[in-house]
């Protein structure tokens, strides 16, 4: 849940408020998708975004402690930051789950960034799925 929802400070009469919380949620889903991508190293057993910080079915108070008090967000492994394409995804995630809803990217901005990533990938002559990051963090390209 987005911080403003946990704090009960969301403006329910403003459609933009809903869009901002959706962007936060989208970032959590993108984090989950990235964590399951074999292009960023070995795919480990599934773990929810806050899995290492909260129990399996956390209560609202536990999420408030993690998201509001501790400003916790899902962990971004260093191997993701060593992958050129995934690094851009990580930067996008961080900007989408900003504590301040007004500071978050819009959904349109996320679309534009991903389009840019796709365009960059075409220019480089390879697809993101060809680039693998082994556990040691070095980058290799599949032939």
What name fits each language-model region?
Residues 4-5, 29-33, 66, 92-96, ...:
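Alpha-helical recognition domains of nuclear gene-regulatory proteins
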Residues 6-75:
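Conserved C-lobe activation region of Hanks-type protein kinase-like domains
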Residues 25, 88, 109:
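Charged catalytic carboxylate motif
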Residues 70, 94-103:
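Conserved C-lobe terminal segment of protein kinase catalytic domains
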Residues 102-143:
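Regulatory extensions flanking the kinase catalytic core
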Residues 82-97:
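Conserved C-terminal C-lobe helix
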Residues 12-13, 40-45, 74, 78, ...:
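Short, flexible/disordered secondary-structure transition segments
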């Amino acid at each position: 849940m987005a911080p403003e929802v946990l704090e009960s400070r969301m403006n329910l009469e403003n459609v933009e408020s809903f869009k901002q919380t959706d962007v936060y949620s989208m970032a959590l889903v993108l984090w989950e998708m990235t964590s399951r991508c074999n292009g960023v190293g070995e795919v480990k057993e599934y773990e929810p975004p806050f899995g290492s910080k909260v129990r399996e079915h956390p209560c609202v108070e536990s999420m408030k402690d993690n998201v509001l008090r501790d400003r916790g967000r899902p962990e971004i492994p260093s191997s993701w930051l060593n992958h050129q394409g995934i690094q851009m995804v990580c930067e996008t995630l961080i900007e989408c789950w900003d504590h301040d809803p007004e500071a978050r990217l819009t959904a349109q901005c996320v679309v534009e960034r991903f389009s840019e990533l796709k365009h960059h990938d075409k220019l480089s002559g390879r697809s993101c799925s060809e680039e693998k990051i082994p556990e040691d963090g070095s980058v290799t390209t599949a032939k």
